[in-house]
């Protein structure tokens, strides 16, 4: 397991930050000596979730490679997604890097510096079996209750298509909303839906449709403040794709890697 022994979870979003003196390692600025501090938003499997007291997932394993390159240990801070995409968590010195299955968007790039894309993503609809849903048009025509995660590109996408949705604070709440009947259909990132459907507890649900939104995920650092860290992250992404580490992480958390991926 790539992340074994490398990742520690800080249960409070205020566990590190402005109070500690920053250090520089290989030109990269770090808020805490001996650690690469990562802001994320839990739970968001398969990219990050807590299992057995540890945070694990796709993003965790990739950032562990960055921490290893720096000779430090990754430390994870759970913080609201809103504070990640607006850059406020990074600006407050709570973390060095944001890794949260976050889509690269121009409006977000005004506040944070993105790495190169590390994951090609899209959206999906998950619904109870038998509803006959194959598109957003079906959701609208059948007047079904649609659920989405707050402040996400999935929510933005369905709203842009003229649909209203019940907004849930995180992906776990969104899934529970579907299970409890608060929503008939939910929109979420495709790999997240794939992960949910592997759980026998979700056997009565199905992948109703994929929505090709052309999204790509990126990691992020404080705007205009840490170019060496972004450079190092990009280097690790490139190297991991060449040496097979990225493929191993992909197959571990997502499944078979697409050709050319």
PLM regions with names:
Residues 17-19:
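Bacterial signal peptide processing site
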Residues 75-138:
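Acidic, polar ligand-binding/catalytic clefts
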Residues 12-15:
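C-terminal motif of bacterial Sec signal peptides marking the signal peptidase cleavage site
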Residues 42, 119-127, 190, 194, ...:
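Periplasmic-binding protein-like
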